[in-house]
Structure formats: structure tokens, C-alpha cells
Regions:
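Aromatic-lined, polymer-binding surfaces characteristic
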Residues: 57-58, 64, 104-215
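Low-complexity, Ser/Thr/Pro/Gly-enriched N-terminal "stalk/linker" regions
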Residues: 23-95
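Generic structural "secondary-structure junction" signal
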Residues: 93-96, 148-150
């Protein structure tokens, strides 16, 4: 009985090995999407952007319609906003008590304020909100990580404290990076009039934290 079972197992192993050797790597996606096809599918020069240029005031008036004044009024509420600092203990609290709110609350308030200021500037287009947007961008760039404390366990070192040697892409960092990317796209010329180092720093942070990490 044991001999018969042994022979059966050997036969199954041989059958498996034979089929493994016979397996053909098809690479269907790689064959279908060669370099030329991918190149022809790419939309270069930001031609895919569906929104008006910053200087196209008529375009933004049409795009925002009756909501234009609402966006401006909302942004005005943050002209004197005091940017929140996410403290080291705010991150550590997730490991101590399991509370993620203490870190996410100031982080979320900053992101919301920055978004409101950005949309107000896009709606008005007079540069009135630029300095405060720069403040928000600077606060974001100075953060060690854009990821939420509850997701920092994805770091190789683990834990809930942000490492400056490794970046994590989660919903928090992805959402903020998306917002900062639009800010860079539309307001880089305005930033450069104030100081070119502002947009240079923002571009660097997006590259290192998101693009390099993803790639």
C-alpha cells in the first residue's frame, strides 16, 4: 500500500514538472503594448488637463459659474489661518492608545485650508491668496511624511512614527500630493515671482515622496 502511494506521488510530481517545463511565457501585455504604442497613447504637454489656464479668467468664470463667489468667500476665511503643527507625540499616540484622530485632525485641517485657499485663488485670480498658499505648501514640505500615523506600519521599520529615510504612499499622502501637484501646475509662475525656491522645493518633495517611491 505504501509502495503504491509512493509511486502515485512520484507520478504526480513528474507530471507537474513536465507541465512546468512546457509552460510558455506569453507576456501578453508586454507584446501588446510595445514602445511605439505606448508612446502614441501618451498625451504630452499637459494637453490632458480639462481645466482653463490660470490666466484665463473668462474660462474660470464660466467653469465655476454661480459658485465663484462661494469659493472666494470660503478662501477668505483662511487668510489669517494659523497652520497646525503635527507634533511627534501626535504620531506616537496611535501606538500608545490606538487613537489616530490626534494626528489626523491637524493634518486634515491644514489640507482643507490649503484646498480652500487654492480654489479661492483660482476663482479670483488676483494673487490675494498666494502668500497664504505658500505658507501651507511650506508647512506640507516640512513634514517628515504625508502618510497617516495609522498607516506608517508600512515602513520597513514599522511603528507609527514617520521615518525620513522611507516614504509611504497611502490615501493621506496620495490626496495631499494630488492637491500639491495641481498647486504646482497652476501657481508655479506666481510662486517664482515671490521666490523660485518655493516651487523648486515643492517639485522636489513630490518627486521624492511620490514619484520615486511609486516607481
Amino acid at each position: 500500500m505504501r509502495t503504491q502511494r509512493f509511486i502515485t506521488i512520484v507520478c504526480l510530481l513528474l507530471w507537474t514538472v513536465a507541465h512546468l517545463h512546457a509552460y510558455e511565457k506569453r507576456n501578453l501585455l508586454q507584446k501588446e503594448a510595445d514602445f511605439e504604442k505606448v508612446k502614441s497613447a501618451l498625451i504630452m504637454g499637459q494637453k490632458w488637463v480639462p481645466y482653463p489656464d490660470y490666466s484665463d479668467r473668462a474660462g474660470w468664470d464660466k467653469f465655476l459659474g454661480d459658485y465663484k463667489e462661494d469659493y472666494i468667500r470660503k478662501g477668505e476665511c483662511f487668510l489669517d489661518y494659523e497652520w497646525k503643527i503635527v507634533k511627534a507625540t501626535d504620531y506616537l499616540e496611535y501606538g500608545r492608545s490606538g487613537s489616530r484622530t490626534i494626528m489626523e485632525s491637524p493634518f486634515g485641517k491644514n489640507n482643507s485650508a490649503l484646498g480652500s485657499l487654492f480654489m479661492a485663488e483660482m476663482a479670483e485670480g488676483k494673487g490675494r491668496f498666494i502668500d497664504q498658499i505658500i505658507n501651507g505648501v511650506f508647512v506640507s514640505c516640512e513634514m517628515t511624511s504625508w502618510a497617516l500615523s495609522a498607516h506608517l506600519g508600512l515602513q520597513k521599520i514599522g511603528g507609527c512614527f514617520p521615518s525620513n529615510e522611507e516614504h509611504v504612499i497611502d490615501l493621506g499622502s496620495g490626496n495631499l500630493a494630488s492637491q500639491l501637484s495641481w498647486i504646482y501646475y497652476y501657481l508655479k509662475p506666481s510662486f517664482d515671482k515671490v521666490n523660485p525656491l518655493i516651487s523648486k522645493r515643492l517639485r522636489h518633495e513630490l518627486q521624492v515622496r511620490i514619484l520615486d517611491t511609486y516607481m
